[in-house]
């Protein structure tokens, strides 16, 4: 199965410009009080309500948190909050809180299955505490935390201390139920100050 990622998609029969979209790089999902809580880590563009140019010394990401009856509903609420279409074609990682139920993966991941732009090789992980906490990690070195998460997972796989779990791996279990291992990520306080060269 080969999944292709495309940067072009249409809405109501017309192509959306980059200024009309918000690029989502990472997503956190939790289940609280009968609703899904979604945290989207999105890239700040110059036109997002401000004429101020981007500060290239900062990470230039922001997190939007919304809830809904389904994950798709929560994403749509985030779009209303942002005032723009959320594009999931750049999604690199999806993190889950431990209270999420994966017993019906086809229904659970319908938001991704029905979106032709979502890359089925996107990394999946579990949060040691909450997915929202992971999505709110602020970096100051110009890289996105989604990139750091995927790098941590790949390094763990290389060193034999964890396993990789991609969306396509989990979806492959829909018709043949089985256990799927998923890496767990936790937030650790940095030792020392950035000025000392420690992270």
Pin down the residues of each PLM region.
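Membrane-proximal alpha-helical signals and transmembrane carboxylates
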Residues: 1-199
């Amino acid at each position: 199965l080969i999944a292709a990622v495309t940067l072009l998609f249409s809405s109501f029969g017309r192509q959306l410009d980059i200024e009309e979209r918000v690029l989502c790089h990472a997503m956190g999902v939790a289940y609280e009080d009968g609703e899904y809580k979604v945290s989207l880590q999105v890239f700040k563009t110059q036109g997002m309500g401000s004429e101020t140019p981007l500060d290239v010394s900062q990470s230039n990401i922001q997190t939007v948190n919304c809830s809904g009856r389904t994950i798709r509903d929560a994403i749509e609420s985030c779009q209303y909050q942002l005032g723009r279409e959320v594009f999931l074609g750049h999604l690199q990682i999806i993190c889950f809180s431990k209270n999420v139920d994966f017993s019906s993966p086809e229904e659970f991941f319908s938001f991704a299955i029905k979106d032709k732009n979502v890359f089925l090789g996107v990394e999946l992980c579990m949060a040691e505490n909450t997915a929202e906490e992971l999505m709110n990690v602020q970096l100051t070195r110009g890289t996105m935390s989604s990139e750091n998460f995927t790098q941590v997972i790949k390094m763990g796989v290389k060193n034999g201390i964890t396993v990789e779990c991609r969306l396509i791996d989990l979806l492959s279990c829909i018709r043949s139920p089985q256990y799927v291992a998923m890496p767990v990520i936790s937030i650790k306080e940095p030792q020392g100050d950035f000025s000392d060269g420690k992270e």
